[in-house]
Design a protein with these regions (language model features):
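Short, Gly/Pro- and small/polar-rich lid/capping loops
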Residues: 1-41
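Generic signature of intrinsically disordered, low-complexity, basic-rich segments
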Residues: 8, 52-54
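Short beta-strand elements
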Residues: 36-46, 56-58
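Metal- or metallocofactor-binding catalytic centers and their adjacent structured scaffolds
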Residues: 54-124
């Protein structure tokens, strides 16, 4: 059942922030001394036209999230490219509902296809 407070994503913006760590962090054979943070701003609108915005941020810790023989730069670039693709997909996502429902629908319906498409033909 829809409610007047249901929201739909109207806009999504992505910012990459370079951050140097205070101390080196070791992940297996690799050492992290800096990281790129992906910061996102999402704007939503409810059925009455009221708007709200929210922010989220996560570090793209290449060595931690993607241990591989590929170079750091190849993995870092791919993570940033996928973040840009996700941001575009969120901006076009037209599902309406409670924010948790909207997010869950994106995870279940959009993300698997986006991930498969992005990974098609990529090296491990």
């Amino acid at each position: 059942m829809s409610k007047k407070t249901d929201v739909c994503v109207e806009k999504a913006e992505l910012y990459f922030l370079p951050v140097e760590t205070r101390v080196p962090l070791k992940f297996g054979a690799e050492t992290l001394t800096y990281v790129t943070c992906a910061r996102v701003r999402v704007e939503v609108e409810d059925r009455e036209g009221k708007r709200a915005e929210g922010w989220g941020e996560t570090p793209l810790s290449v060595q931690w999230v993607w241990p591989a023989d590929l170079s750091y730069e190849v993995r870092h670039k791919a993570l940033k490219e996928f973040c840009m693709e996700l941001t575009g997909a969120w901006a076009e996502w037209e599902v309406e509902g409670h924010p948790m429902e909207v997010g869950h629908a994106f995870l279940e319906e959009a993300l698997p296809e986006l991930l498969d498409g992005f990974n098609a033909g990529r090296e491990e």
